[in-house]
C-alpha cells in the first residue's frame, strides 16, 4: 500500500506523462509490411512548414536575426505509394477538407499517369480526413479509406519517414532566401527523388526504376 494520498500519486504520474492507462502499457512492436502491387495503397499526410522572408535560424544559427514574424505557414501535402515509394507532393495554404480532397484527386491523377491505379488510401485521424466530405470523396474515387489507430502515427510510418526525408533533403537542405524560393525547388527535388535517388528498401533502385521493372 502507498503511504501518500491517491491525489498526490496521480499528480506525480501526470507530471511524468503516465496519467493515462495506455501510457503504462508497453507499445506493440511495429508491424512492417509492403503491398505487392504498386497501386494497392498510398499513404497521405500533411507537414506544416513556416513561411519566411529571409534565411532562417536553422542556417544562421541566430533565432533573432533569422525570425520572420507574422508570415504564417505552408502545408506540405504528401502522397507516397506503399510498394514502390513513388511520391507526389504539393505545397498548399491549408489542410481543410476541401484542400485535402483536391490534393487527393490530383495525386490519384498523377499516379494514374505513371501507370499506377490506386485502390486504398491510408491517413491519420486529422479533421479533414475524418470529415464526411472526405469519406464521400473516397467513395466517388473508388478508394477504400484506411485510418490509423488513434495516437499511433507510426502506423502511417511510410508517410512519416518520407516527410523526414523531404525536410532533410529539400526544405532544410540549403539556405533559401525565402519560402517562395524553397517551394520553387520542390518539383526539382521530387524529380530527383522519384527518378534517381536510390532507396535501400528497393535494393538500391529509385522508385521509378522499381516501378518500371514491375510494370514491364
Label for each model-derived stretch:
Residues 19-80, 86, 102, 117:
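Mobile-element integrase/transposase regions
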Amino acid at each position: 500500500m502507498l503511504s501518500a494520498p491517491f491525489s498526490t500519486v496521480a499528480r506525480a504520474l501526470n507530471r511524468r506523462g503516465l496519467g493515462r492507462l495506455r501510457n503504462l502499457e508497453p507499445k506493440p512492436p511495429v508491424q512492417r509490411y509492403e503491398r505487392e502491387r504498386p497501386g494497392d495503397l498510398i499513404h497521405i499526410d500533411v507537414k506544416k512548414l513556416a513561411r519566411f522572408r529571409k534565411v532562417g535560424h536553422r542556417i544562421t544559427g541566430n533565432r533573432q536575426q533569422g525570425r520572420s514574424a507574422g508570415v504564417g505557414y505552408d502545408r506540405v501535402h504528401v502522397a507516397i505509394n506503399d510498394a514502390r515509394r513513388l511520391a507526389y507532393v504539393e505545397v498548399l495554404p491549408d489542410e481543410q477538407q476541401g484542400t485535402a480532397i483536391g490534393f487527393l484527386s490530383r495525386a490519384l491523377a498523377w499516379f494514374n499517369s505513371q501507370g499506377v491505379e490506386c485502390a486504398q488510401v491510408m491517413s491519420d485521424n486529422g479533421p479533414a480526413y475524418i470529415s464526411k466530405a472526405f469519406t464521400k470523396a473516397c467513395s466517388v474515387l473508388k478508394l477504400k479509406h484506411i485510418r490509423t489507430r488513434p495516437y499511433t502515427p507510426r502506423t502511417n510510418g511510410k508517410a512519416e519517414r518520407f516527410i523526414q526525408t523531404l525536410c532533410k533533403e529539400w526544405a532544410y537542405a540549403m539556405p533559401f532566401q525565402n519560402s517562395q524560393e524553397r517551394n520553387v525547388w520542390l518539383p526539382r527535388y521530387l524529380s530527383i527523388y522519384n527518378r534517381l535517388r536510390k532507396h535501400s528498401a528497393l535494393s538500391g533502385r529509385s522508385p521509378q526504376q522499381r516501378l518500371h521493372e514491375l510494370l514491364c
